[in-house]
Amino acid sequence: MNTYKIYLINFDDGFIYVGKTKNTLIHRLKQHKANLISGKSYKLYEHWKSIDIDPSIECLECNLSKKKAIQLEHDYTLAYMFLNQ
């Protein structure tokens, strides 16, 4: 069974990113650089490139099924958007 992780990338300037991956986070970020995909993943990469701030990265949840990871990614994204208003 593939297990997923939910992680939070938090920049000091208020920009946050919540994402899910079944790979390591480093591998996932390399995928972002290799495949400049649209959406919030691309916004993360562009923001990271444009500033000189190293973000804090933390794992919020691990050992999740894909279905649960998708739901939690959505829930955490909404929660952090609400907190940063």
Give residue ranges: language-model regions.
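Structure-specific nucleic-acid interaction/processing domains
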Residues: M1-Q85
